[in-house]
């Protein structure tokens, strides 16, 4: 099986990568079948041989995750939605919904408490007013 992968080169701690097509059983920095591009993560420079990449992809070459990301950014393949991304978005949506329900519940409880307090204050005030208006019989 042919893989599209990154082949490391450069100084220590200053790596650059060549995008290569190679046999899936060969070493990371082994001899490639074909060099298809270049990627420098420090400067974000990317050069891709679009025609050769399309040819290799049509032949059934499988890109690694890092190469797939580069190809998506380069516009050579469509962005794929991975199952983990879908699950993550669903979890975030469920959490937001639960937080909204909790906030609405707390707001309703606070409103009910405020209404009960206002009602108690009004009853106490009317009771005080009724006691003051009644004539004192002695």
Curated annotation (Swiss-Prot):
It comes from Synechococcus sp. (strain WH7803). PANTHER family: 30S RIBOSOMAL PROTEIN S16, SMALL RIBOSOMAL SUBUNIT PROTEIN BS16M. It holds the Pfam family Ribosomal_S16. The keyword Ribonucleoprotein applies. Residues 94-122 have a biased composition (Basic and acidic residues). Belongs to the bacterial ribosomal protein bS16 family. One of its GO terms (cellular component) is small ribosomal subunit. The keyword Cytoplasm does not apply. Keywords: Ribonucleoprotein, Ribosomal protein. Signal peptide: none annotated. One of its GO terms (biological process) is translation. Residues 92-138 are annotated as: Disordered. One of its GO terms (molecular function) is structural constituent of ribosome. NCBIfam families: S16 (TIGR00002). HAMAP family: Ribosomal_bS16. This is Small ribosomal subunit protein bS16.
């Amino acid at each position: 099986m042919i893989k599209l992968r990154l082949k490391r080169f450069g100084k220590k701690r200053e790596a650059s990568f060549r995008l290569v097509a190679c046999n899936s059983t060969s070493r990371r920095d082994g001899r490639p079948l074909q060099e298809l591009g270049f990627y420098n993560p420090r400067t974000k420079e990317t050069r891709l041989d679009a025609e050769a990449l399309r040819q290799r992809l049509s032949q059934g070459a499988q890109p690694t995750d890092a190469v797939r990301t580069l190809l998506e950014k380069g516009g050579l393949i469509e962005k794929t939605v991975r199952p983990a991304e879908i699950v993550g978005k669903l979890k975030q949506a469920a959490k937001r919904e639960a937080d909204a329900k909790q906030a609405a519940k707390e707001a309703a409880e606070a409103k009910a408490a405020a209404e009960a307090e206002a009602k108690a204050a009004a009853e106490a005030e009317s009771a005080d007013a009724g006691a003051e208006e009644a004539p004192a019989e002695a």
